[in-house]
Amino acid sequence: MAYDLEEQEQIDEFKAWWKTYGKYVLLAVAVVLFTFFGIQGWRYYQHRQALMASTQYETLSQADAKDLKLIRSISAELMDKFSGTAYAGRAALIVAKANYIANDSKSAKAQLDWARNNAQEEPIKAIAQLQLAAMQLEE
């Protein structure tokens, strides 16, 4: 009987504790779950964006150098929709080169300037800066 009484006391203590702190425990569990699933969702989104950007960049790198319209459209999409990826800066360099070859130095400078200011990788920024300086020296 003492064993049952002791168990009943523990149950009553737990019920009292739960009544006092139960809301906070549930709130903490909800915050942890929300944070966990939020982080997982963000990682999935970033992975999906990188995969889509990679696919677009692959298409861009395989495009015919003379197909300026295709190069411009793919580069614009990469630079607009996927500007947070490393592919955007690289796309800007590719379209700048294509514009330069097509004697559209104004657009080439604009693309190089975009790459210099917005690329995620420092080497891409440096390349854009050097190419922009070389174009300005030619003038």
Regions found by a protein language model. Name each.
Residues 1-31:
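N-terminal positive-inside, membrane-proximal cytosolic segments immediately preceding the first
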Residues 24, 79-88, 102, 116-125:
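Short solvent-exposed coil/turn linkers within tandem alpha-helical repeat scaffolds
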Residues 75, 112-113:
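Inward-facing hydrophobic residues that define packing positions of alpha-helical scaffold repeats
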